[in-house]
């Protein structure tokens, strides 16, 4: 049968990336406690593409996803990238999987068991320049109360929900990053609060006011000794404004002198 994709292309234009995206598959993710959490992963996978061929073989991306990634781990992601690089004769490959991750939470006073989902993802790259790199990301919703509003107001203070997105490299569990984020905010969020819980949360937040800047700085100091490379983005959905407040802080990984010469940069982005 004729292989149209492998036919020679006279245009001689290489492509930075070809692949597939928005592929949904059932997966399991390892938890800190040693278990496996079932969830649904949304995948993107692709490679660079040489100038000499007309097209890639898209079906091979699906084949490697089905073959390797029922369970997600750094080892499985690397094996998947090595496989697709070999099958498509590429020099670099990338895969990203986004998934909802469930965490168990007890209400602060009544101790009722609840479950809250956060958005998480793993992005893995394999190429000759950076080698194998995995970046993990999680977005954690929390609660902030404005320090200025509290100090200038005779009664109350404006407060709101905040999304904190952390991307990092290194051996950190999703659960540990979630805990660090929640401890940096005015208060965590809870799917369920009875009246004693609500009283506790609102009063504790009042005693622990945080700007978005405070959350970003406090979280940076906690993550700094734990990861060589990370990015923090704090977004506050202001309750008294039609706009959001934002704070961003990055820590970039140092690279060797040879890497600096070859890449003309002193630090490596971790996102």
UniProtKB/Swiss-Prot annotation:
This is GTP cyclohydrolase FolE2. InterPro entries: GTP_cyclohydrolase_FolE2, GTP_cyclohydrolase_FolE2/MptA. Belongs to the GTP cyclohydrolase IV family. The lineage of its organism: Bacteria, Pseudomonadati, Coprothermobacterota, Coprothermobacteria, Coprothermobacterales. It holds the Pfam family GCHY-1. Its EC number is 3.5.4.16. It is an enzyme of class 3 (hydrolase). NCBIfam families: PRK13674.1-1. Converts GTP to 7,8-dihydroneopterin triphosphate. The gene is folE2. Pathway: Cofactor biosynthesis; 7,8-dihydroneopterin triphosphate biosynthesis; 7,8-dihydroneopterin triphosphate from GTP: step 1/1. It catalyses: GTP + H2O = 7,8-dihydroneopterin 3'-triphosphate + formate + H(+).
